[in-house]
Amino acid sequence: MKIRFCGAARSVTGSCHMITFEGGSILVDCGMRQGEDAHTDYGEGDFPFIPSDIKALLITHAHIDHTGMVPLLVKRGFNGPIFSTEATAKLCGIMLPDSAHIQEQDAEYQNRKNERAGKPLVEPLYTAQDAENSLKLFKGVRYDSIIQICPGVEARFTDVGHLLGSAAIEVWVTEGGKKTRIVFSGDIGRDDRPIIKDPESPEGADYLVLESTYGDRLHTEAFELYQADRKSTV
């Protein structure tokens, strides 16, 4: 078994991790790189793998830096199941078509400039139809249920309180009679927030892939922030 980091390694956006095992490969997230991270081969749509070879895709949450390349993945040949929580699947039903609309608008704007300059026209990274095609592959799952992803691979989604539907994903890979447990944290939320539940911690792992966007600082307690806002308002 191997884990390959195809995105969000030494950068913040573009989460995409590949697990390769005896039976093939699966992905955890397929996000769009944004800002300075966008100017890379992956950010321009060149996957470091063959999309049609991927058995399944698991999504931690709906934010575009974790899902924004899913329509392109499908456009390039991926046709496997996409597993996410039910809430994430519904949010992607809004966000992926919206992202496709932006891609189409950007291409249209660029082509107006290219026509005036006598340059070749460009195509959008993906279209609204590509987004709709990808949404047909989503399979909503419940928190805390162990599901089979493909032969030799199981997974469980655990609430991490980042946004509605967000999850850490525990993946069990069985090969050669040995079961290995890998935990992908996704983006982790904070305790004591309204509406969103507090993060839950999976019980142990052989390997942990942990987000570290704010790993070098301590957050102010939510109640202290509320008190400060209340005082400044009054």
Describe each region flagged by the PLM.
Residues K2, C16-V28, D46, T180, ...:
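Catalytic cores of nucleotide-enabled group-transfer and carboxylate-activating enzymes in metabolic
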Residues K2-C6, T20-F21, V141-E200:
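Catalytic core of the metallo-beta-lactamase
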Residues A9-S11, F21-G80, S84-F138, I188-P199:
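Pre-active-site segment of Zn-dependent metallo-hydrolases
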Residues Y42, F223-D229:
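Charged helix-capping and loop-helix junction motifs
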Residues V171, A205-R217:
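Gly-rich Lys/Arg/Thr-decorated short loops/hinges at beta-loop-alpha junctions or inter-strand turns
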Residues I196-K197, H219-F223:
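Short, solvent-exposed loop/turn segments at secondary-structure boundaries
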Residues K231-V234:
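Conserved small/polar residues in nucleotide/adenosyl-binding loops
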